[in-house]
Regions:
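Transmembrane beta-strand segments of Gram-negative outer membrane beta-barrel proteins
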Residues: 23-36, 66
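Cleavable N-terminal export/targeting peptides
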Residues: 1-27
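Secretion/assembly modules of Gram-negative surface proteins
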Residues: 22-27, 46-61, 90-92, 144
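Hydrophobic secondary-structure block in the mid-to-C-terminal portion of proteins
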Residues: 156-191
Length: 191
């Protein structure tokens, strides 16, 4: 995944190196997740439901139109104390369109389950077996649409499609799929 991100960044930089985007300002973007939905279902066929996620999205866009970012958020499952914790590194491109901001990007990182019995080294006191979960690799693509409020500030909405199929139970080797979609809002500051 890292090779794909680096190759995409290099190719796009070479293709767009004569574009007017090089005069664009630096931008710092701060966002928060608003909704997290899961594409998989529980073992009984019911939908996996989540409470509102907490965390942040941070992005820094450079004058060349490309940027780097970090996503870090936790989503609590409804009716449970368990959470899924997601951490991603992102690379993105902002199209050079006046007044509106359109961003596309890719991310790579980790997801893990967080609960009292989810730690990788957790041993069930009754059975003596390790029943915890290993953190899994995750990837995402995302897009963001923003509108400038002033020359220095814009407000934006984002959509992330997260693939996370590799959270593995230590004892059984069963892999858990917590892929899904995350929607967020944020502000970007130009300088």
């Amino acid at each position: 995944m890292k090779k794909i991100i680096l190759s995409a960044f290099t190719a796009t930089t070479l293709i767009l190196s004569n574009s007017s985007i090089f005069a664009a300002p630096h931008t710092i973007s701060l966002g928060i997740p608003q909704q997290h939905t899961f594409t998989e279902k529980n073992e009984d066929g019911s939908k996996i439901e989540a409470d509102e996620p907490s965390g942040y999205f941070i992005g820094i866009k450079f004058p060349v139109g490309f940027g780097l970012g970090i996503d870090s958020y936790k989503t609590k499952f409804k009716g449970d104390t368990s959470k899924i914790v997601t951490f991603m590194y992102n690379i993105f491109y902002q199209f050079p369109i006046p007044v509106i901001d359109i961003i596309i990007g890719l991310g790579s990182g980790k997801t893990k389950l967080a609960c009292s019995a989810c730690a990788e080294d957790y041993t069930d006191p009754e059975s003596g077996k390790k029943t915890g979960y290993k953190a899994g690799e995750a990837s995402q693509w995302f897009t963001s649409f923003g509108i400038q409020l002033t020359q220095l500030i814009d407000i934006h909405m984002s959509y992330r499609s997260v693939t996370s199929k590799k959270i593995e139970q230590v004892f059984s080797g069963t892999k858990v799929n917590y892929s899904g979609n995350v929607r967020g809002i944020g502000l970007a500051f130009n300088f």
